Amino acid sequence: MAVGKEILTKIRSVQNTQKITKAMQMVSTSKMRKTQERMRLARPYAEKVRMVMSHLAQTNTDHGIPLLESHREIRRVGFILITSDKGLCGGLNANVLKKFLAQVQEYQNQGIEEEIVCLGSKGLMACQSIGLNVVASAVNLGDTPKMEMLLGPLTELFQRYEKHEIDRIHLVYSGFVNTMRQEPRMEVLLPIGENVIGDSAPKSPFSWEYRYEPTALAVLEYLVRRYLESVVYQALSDNMASEQAARMVAMKAATDNAGNAIKELRLVYNKSRQAAITTELSEIVAGAAAV
C-alpha cells in the first residue's frame, strides 16, 4: 500500500492548498467591497471640485494656467501607469500592460518620447525590464493608499507639463465594471478636455455672484491640481477594486480545481486500494487451495 500512502499524502497537500485559496477568496471579497465603498464616497468630492473648477474656468477665460492649456504640438508624452503590487489576480496586469505598451509603441513609431510614472510594482518591473523611461514611481501602496503617497510622483509629472516639457499625459489603469469583468482603460488626463471644463452645473433660475479669496485665479489654480489628483485617486481605487475582483475569481477557480483534483485522487486511491484487496484475497484463496 505504498502507492496508497503517496496518494493520501497528495490529497492532504491539495486540501491544504484548497484551504489557502478559499481563505484568499474570502479576503478578496471583503477587500473588494471596502474598495467599492471608498470609490462611492470619493465621487461626490471629485464631482464638486470639477463643477467649481468648471465655473471658474468659464468666468475667467484669460486665466493663463498652463494645466488648462488645450492645444499643443505633441513632442513628448507622459503616462501614469497603475497596476497592482501583488500577483494572483489572473490576467489583470497583463491586459493593462498590453494596452499601455501598444500606445507607447505607436508614439515611438512617430518619434514621440515618453516619460512614465508607475503606481504599483508590477508595472514598474515590466517597464524596467524592457528599458522604458520611468521617471518616478510609488509602490507598496497597501489596501488603503493615502493621497500623500502619490503626491511626489504626480507633482513631478504635472510640473513638467506646466514647463512644456511634456505635452500630453495619459492615465492607464484597469476599470472595474463588475465582479466578473474588468477592462483596461486609457484616458487623456492632460490637457483637460472640454467635456470637463464645459458647463455641467445644474441649471438654476437664479444668477449667483461668487466672491473668491484670495482671488478667483488662485482658487482655480488650486482646484485644477486637486481635480487632477482626485481623478488619479479614483483610477487607483478603480484598479484596486478590479484587482480584488480578479483575485477573488482566480482563487475561486483555484478552489474549485482543487476540489476536482481531490475527487480524482480519491478515485485513484479507492481503485488502488480495491486492487490491493483483490490481490490479497486471490493470494489467500490460492494458498488455501494449495493446502
From Swiss-Prot:
Keywords: ATP synthesis, Cell inner membrane, Cell membrane, CF(1), Hydrogen ion transport, Ion transport, Membrane, Transport. One of its GO terms (cellular component) is plasma membrane. It is found in: Cell inner membrane. SUPFAM superfamilies: ATP synthase (F1-ATPase), gamma subunit. InterPro entries: ATP_synth_F1_ATPase_gsu, ATP_synth_F1_gsu, ATP_synth_F1_gsu_CS. Its main location: membrane. The keyword Cell inner membrane applies. GO terms for biological process: proton motive force-driven plasma membrane ATP synthesis. GO terms for molecular function: ATP binding; proton-transporting ATP synthase activity, rotational mechanism. The keyword NADP does not apply. It is a peripheral membrane protein. Belongs to the ATPase gamma chain family. Produces ATP from ADP in the presence of a proton gradient across the membrane. The gamma chain is believed to be important in regulating ATPase activity and the flow of protons through the CF(0) complex. F-type ATPases have 2 components, CF(1) - the catalytic core - and CF(0) - the membrane proton channel. CF(1) has five subunits: alpha(3), beta(3), gamma(1), delta(1), epsilon(1). CF(0) has three main subunits: a, b and c. This is ATP synthase gamma chain. It comes from Neisseria meningitidis serogroup A / serotype 4A (strain DSM 15465 / Z2491). The lineage of its organism: Bacteria, Pseudomonadati, Pseudomonadota, Betaproteobacteria, Neisseriales.
